[in-house]
Swiss-Prot record:
This is Sec-independent protein translocase protein TatB. The keyword DNA-binding does not apply. Part of the twin-arginine translocation (Tat) system that transports large folded proteins containing a characteristic twin-arginine motif in their signal peptide across membranes. Together with TatC, TatB is part of a receptor directly interacting with Tat signal peptides. TatB may form an oligomeric binding site that transiently accommodates folded Tat precursor proteins before their translocation. It is a single-pass membrane protein. Belongs to the TatB family. GO terms for cellular component: TAT protein transport complex. It comes from Herminiimonas arsenicoxydans. NCBIfam families: tatB. GO terms for biological process: protein transport by the Tat complex.
């Protein structure tokens, strides 16, 4: 703020001592300190208020720019939608007058060919891995329950051969 060196402060202090006197100098110094503090606080408040106003102006400008961009995007989307809508309506109107072979339902032969092709693709997808490889790698092809597995792999000595009815 103000550049005051120690020598200048000493000269001001000696002049104040001569003009004011030693009795009133402490009260005048206190009053000058409080006034100086008030002035500094007031200047800081004004600075912060000005910076806040500048930030608000910048935010208002940014808000306006964003709103303008949003309205431009909205207009362009609306134009694209209306253009697509008009082209769709014109294509629909043209298709009403002409018979389109793509819009006809498939015949019975076509649908049966499609289902046969699906079965062939499904069979090719499931049998892509040979069964000998499945057996060798240990992939299970059939799943059995836990009780059936226990009965299958139980040793002969552990099996009971008691009749069901006594």
């Amino acid at each position: 703020m103000i550049d005051i060196a120690f020598s200048k402060l000493a000269i001001i202090g000696v002049a104040a001592l001569v003009f004011i006197g030693p009795e009133k100098l402490p009260t005048v110094a206190r009053m000058a300190g409080t006034l100086f503090g008030r002035a500094q606080r007031y200047i800081n408040d004004v600075k912060s208020e000005v910076s806040r106003e500048m930030e608000l102006d910048e935010l208002r400008k940014m808000h306006k720019d964003v709103q303008d961009a949003a309205t431009d995007v909205e207009r362009s989307i609306a134009q694209n939608i209306s253009a697509a809508d008009s082209s769709l309506h014109s294509a629909w109107d043209e298709s009403d007058t002409d018979t389109n072979p793509l819009m006809e339902p498939p015949t019975l032969d076509q649908s049966s060919d499609k289902s046969k092709n699906f079965r062939k693709k499904k069979l090719a997808a499931t049998s892509a891995v040979p069964s000998w490889y499945k057996r060798q790698s240990g992939q299970k092809s059939r799943v059995i329950s836990g009780a059936a597995r226990m009965a299958k792999f139980r040793p002969a000595s552990a099996r009971k051969s008691t009749p069901f009815f006594h």
